[in-house]
Design a protein with these regions (language model features):
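Domain-level signal for Mg2+-assisted phosphodiester chemistry and nucleotide/NA-binding surfaces
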Residues: 1-68
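Nuclease catalytic cores that cleave nucleic-acid phosphodiester bonds
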Residues: 39-129
């Protein structure tokens, strides 16, 4: 299953060991994490606007995006969240996020949502189709 990641999820992913991925994969199949190009742009902006510790985390997230995940081009939108939602709907993929507002909007669109709880990957919402 393809899973498109937002900035919040990616930042936590690089800073915290995450468990339960194998259980999610047993349910959905192999997870292919996708990073939208707009998230990379957002990370690059963050890298220059934060302190040294957070800047190193952002740099690690950018490097990991290119080495371990697939970076995908998404339709440009005024807001990164809109681009992620549009991509998820068009390509029928799940979304990994920590962002409450984005999760709410994804639920309204009946999309599969993966999030973190106590350093474990969980299914926050499942498509009803």
């Amino acid at each position: 299953m393809d899973v498109i990641c937002d900035t919040s999820f990616l930042m936590v992913f690089v800073s915290t060991p995450i468990g339960q991925i194998d259980k999610i994969e047993a349910y959905f199949g192999k997870l292919n994490f996708l990073i939208p190009d707009v998230v990379i742009s957002e990370l690059k902006d963050l890298e220059h606007k934060t302190g040294p510790k957070r800047s190193r985390m952002v740099k690690t997230a950018i490097e990991m995006s290119f080495s371990k995940f697939k970076v995908v081009n998404v339709l440009k939108s005024r807001h990164v969240d809109e681009a992620i939602i549009d991509y998820a709907i068009t390509h029928k993929c799940a979304v990994a996020t920590i962002d409450r507002d984005l999760r709410r909007r994804l639920m309204l669109n009946n999309l599969v949502i993966l999030t973190l709880s106590k350093n474990k990957l969980i299914i926050a919402s499942q498509s009803k189709t």
